[in-house]
């Protein structure tokens, strides 16, 4: 069976509480053998780490999302550092900048993002980035920290090929989610065609951003196959080969040893 790695999901969130075991069964039947659950604040980070520890093939990222930056306190960094020592914790994230919702002041978002980037450098862990309507500021921060970047993933990439090239120059992987399957996404699809095959990832961001043909419904990791199918078709390569490539890329991005 073809094996898939959903590089970014939230299957540990409450929206799956009523039928999580059914979701996990569907994932196994669909060949989604590995997946990463991603924290967004201290509570969800702790929960993601615990969830990963209890589920084979599951890994965790821990960190403070830009929406939650306003609640950050200095002690959070030490707690994240302590939790990072756990075997299934493979990244800091999701961190970054979100200027679409602006749920935390932009200066606060920047400060908290940079503090966690520095923590990732100290821990030598990759970073899972959430970036929305903030690519230039994020790139400026990354370039300032260029000597201390640890690599990682631009999750749910939403920019153009020109923007993707800037992240690639800094050594990041580019991850595509459901929006790449949408009909009105030519710039995103152009990026998906051009990102080098050794730097491309797939994800669902479940329960959000369900791809075609299930758009509008609760998303789940099983649907990562639709993302893989779309990009493989755009690139005119066999689906099985693309699944194998993105599996290895995710293992590389998260420094997961077989």
Indicate where each model-derived feature is located.
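Mid-domain alpha/beta scaffold segments of enzyme catalytic cores
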Residues: 1-258
């Amino acid at each position: 069976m073809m094996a898939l790695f959903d590089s970014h999901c939230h299957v540990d969130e409450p929206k799956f509480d009523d039928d999580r075991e059914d979701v996990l069964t569907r994932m196994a039947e669909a060949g989604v053998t590995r997946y990463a659950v991603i924290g967004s604040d201290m509570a969800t980070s702790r929960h993601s780490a615990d969830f990963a520890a209890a589920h084979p093939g599951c890994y965790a990222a821990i960190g403070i999302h830009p929406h939650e930056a306003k609640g950050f306190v200095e002690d959070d960094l030490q707690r994240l550092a302590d939790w990072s020592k756990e075997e299934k914790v493979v990244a800091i994230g999701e961190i970054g900048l979100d200027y679409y919702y602006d749920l935390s002041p932009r200066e606060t978002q920047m400060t908290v993002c940079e503090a966690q980037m520095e923590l990732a450098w100290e821990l030598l862990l990759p970073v899972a980035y959430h970036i929305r309507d903030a690519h230039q500021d994020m790139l400026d921060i990354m370039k300032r920290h260029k000597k201390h970047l640890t690599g990682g993933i631009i999750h749910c990439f939403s920019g153009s090929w020109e923007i993707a090239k800037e992240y690639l120059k800094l050594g990041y992987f580019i991850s595509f989610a459901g929006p790449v399957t949408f009909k009105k996404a030519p710039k995103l699809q152009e990026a998906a065609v051009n990102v080098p095959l050794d730097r491309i990832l797939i994800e669902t961001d479940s329960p959000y951003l369900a791809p075609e043909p299930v758009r509008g419904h609760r998303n789940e990791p099983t649907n990562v196959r639709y993302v893989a199918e779309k990009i493989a078709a755009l690139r005119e390569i066999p689906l099985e080969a693309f699944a194998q490539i993105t599996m290895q890329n995710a293992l590389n991005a998260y420094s997961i040893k077989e």
